[in-house]
UniProtKB/Swiss-Prot annotation:
Organism: Artemisia annua (Sweet wormwood)
The protein's name: NADPH--cytochrome P450 reductase 1
Any GO BP: sesquiterpene biosynthetic process
Record-linked CDD domains: CYPOR
Chief localization: endoplasmic reticulum
Textual note on the cofactor: Binds 1 FAD per monomer.
Transmembrane segments: 46-66
Tissue: Present in non-glandular trichome cells.
Record-annotated Flavodoxin-like domain positions: 100-250
Amino acid sequence: MQSTTSVKLSPFDLMTALLNGKVSFDTSNTSDTNIPLAVFMENRELLMILTTSVAVLIGCVVVLVWRRSSSAAKKAAESPVIVVPKKVTEDEVDDGRKKVTVFFGTQTGTAEGFAKALVEEAKARYEKAVFKVIDLDDYAAEDDEYEEKLKKESLAFFFLATYGDGEPTDNAARFYKWFTEGEEKGEWLEKLQYAVFGLGNRQYEHFNKIAKVVDEKLVEQGAKRLVPVGMGDDDQCIEDDFTAWKELVWPELDQLLRDEDDTSVATPYTAAVAEYRVVFHDKPETYDQDQLTNGHAVHDAQHPCRSNVAVKKELHSPLSDRSCTHLEFDISNTGLSYETGDHVGVYVENLSEVVDEAEKLIGLPPHTYFSVHTDNEDGTPLGGASLPPPFPPCTLRKALASYADVLSSPKKSALLALAAHATDSTEADRLKFLASPAGKDEYAQWIVASHRSLLEVMEAFPSAKPPLGVFFASVAPRLQPRYYSISSSPKFAPNRIHVTCALVYEQTPSGRVHKGVCSTWMKNAVPMTESQDCSWAPIYVRTSNFRLPSDPKVPVIMIGPGTGLAPFRGFLQERLAQKEAGTELGTAILFFGCRNRKVDFIYEDELNNFVETGALSELVTAFSREGATKEYVQHKMTQKASDIWNLLSEGAYLYVCGDAKGMAKDVHRTLHTIVQEQGSLDSSKAELYVKNLQMAGRYLRDVW
C-alpha cells in the first residue's frame, strides 16, 4: 500500500498562503504530486471558515464605503445647519440710555433734511440719548413687521410731506397705507410719545393731509402727542415753520431726556455747514458721462432707465404764442413697463447757458474732474451735519448740469453757507441777516416773492465763493426729476411712453426770464425720426391710483383742460382697445378746455375719432378766449349738471386732472354745488356726499 505524508497547517500559515497566492509546505521527503490536494482536503473545514470570513470582511468594507459616500452625497445636497449667535442690534442693547427714533417721508429731500437737522441739534443738547434717523421705506421689510417694531418705540418724531392730491410720498406710501387702513388695533401704542412735522403747501386743498392723518391715528391708537403738529408751508418759508416748531419741542425733550438733577442751560446751537470731502483727479482717458445702464429688476428714482426720444412734435398751431410738446420715449428692450394713468419721472440737465453762468460764479475750470465723499480718508464718517448721498465722479460741468438745482430760490441754510465763505464782511452780514428771524420779511419779499434764483443771489454776493464740497452739500439742492402724467395706454403703445408737456417760459418779478428745465429740454429734443444721435433721458415710472374702473361698463366723467387732458388720452386709448376687442363700455364724458380751438386745441383729431368710434360718448369743450365772455370747464359742468348727477347716481367715477391751485379748486366747488342742487341736499350733506365719493375711490384727482 502506498504511503502518504500528512501535512497539517496552522490557520495563520494557511491564511498567509492564501493572501500571498501560494501554499508553502515541505515536499522534500516525497515526490507525490497529489500532496497539494491532500493538504487542502486535510484542511478543508478550516479553509471554508477562512473563505467565508474573507467574503464577509470584503462585504463589510463595501457596505462601509457605500454608506460613507451616500452620507457625503446627502450632506452635499443639504444645507449645513450652522448655529450662528444672534446678532444683537443697537436697538436691543439696554445700556440705560433713552432712544429716540426720527422717521421721514420725503419726495424731494426736504423732510429728510429737517429730520437730520433735528437729530444733529438734539445730539448736541442731549448727550446721553441715542438718536437714529430712519427712512420709512426701510423701517420694515414686510408690512407685518411694522406693529412689532413700533411697539418697541418709546419716543419718535415723524417728518411727513404731503405730495400730489393729498398723497404720501413714495417712500412713506407703504407705511401710511398699513397705518391708516385695515382693522382697528385699539390703544396699542400707549408707551409711545411722539411729535409730527408736516411739509406741504397751503395753496393745495389737502394741506399737510398726511401729517394730520398720521397724528390723528397715533392718538387713536394710544400714543401721547408732545406738541401740536408742525404745519410747514412751502408757499412761504418752510424753514421758519420748522424753526418755530423746534422751539416747542426742546422744552418737552428737556423733561424727557435730561436728568432730574441736570440744571444746566443748553449751549446755543449753531448748525454746522455740511461739506463733502472732495478729491480732485486727472480725468480718465475713457471717462464716460453716460454711466447709466438698463436691465435693473425694478426701475425707480435711484435706478432710472435710459430711454431714447422716439417722436417729438408741436401740438399748438403756428398762431400760438405758447408751446406744447408731444414726446414719446422708446422703452422697447429696456424692461420698463407702465399702466394707464401712471406717471413718468424724467431726469434732464440744466441748459448750457445756465451751466455757463454757474461755472463763472464758482470760478473753477469746467473740466475740473473730482469726486465727493461722505467720509474721511480713514473711512470714518464726516462729523457735523448729515450729508446728502454723493454723486459719481465727474467733471464740474457735468455736476452742475445734472446734480445742482441752481434755478430755485435758495433756502436760508444756503444763505448761511454762502455767508461763511464770503470774503466781503458786508456781504456776509447781509446774507446772515436775510437768514435770520429779523430778516424774515425781507427774505420773503426779496427772494421768495421775487422768485429769485440761487444764481441771482450768488451774482448779488460775488465774494461768496464756497468750495465745491460746500456748494454741492449745502448751497445747491439736488436737481430733482420732473413728473408727467403719461398720456398713452400700453394697450395702444406698449413700447412707448407718451408725454404731453407745456413749455414753461415766463418772466419773474426780478426780471429774469425763467425757462423750465425739463419743458425746454423736451421742446429742443432731437427724436429718432430725425437723427440716430437722438436725445435721451433717464426715466422711471411711478405707479398711480389714477385708474379706470375695473368694470368697463361703469360710467366715467373726465375733466381735464389743457395738458390736463394727458391721462384721459391714455384712458380713451384703453377704452378704444377694449371696444375693438368686443368689450361693452359704459358712458364716458370728457370736459376739455383751452383758449381757442384754432390755436391750442391739442389732439383735436384724436378726440373726434374717439367719439366716432364710441370710445368717448360725448366731448364737451370750453374755449376761454373765443367769445365775449370767458368760458371754462366748470361752466360747462354747470350746464351739464343734470347729466353729471344722473351718472354719479349710476355709480360713475369722476376724474380731474390739471392745475391744483386754480382749476381743480373751481371744479371741486362746482361739483359740490351740483350735488347740493341736483340732489336737493343741504351744504353739509352735499359735502359729505362728495367726501364719500373720494373715500370710495370714485372721485380721483391728478393735480399739480
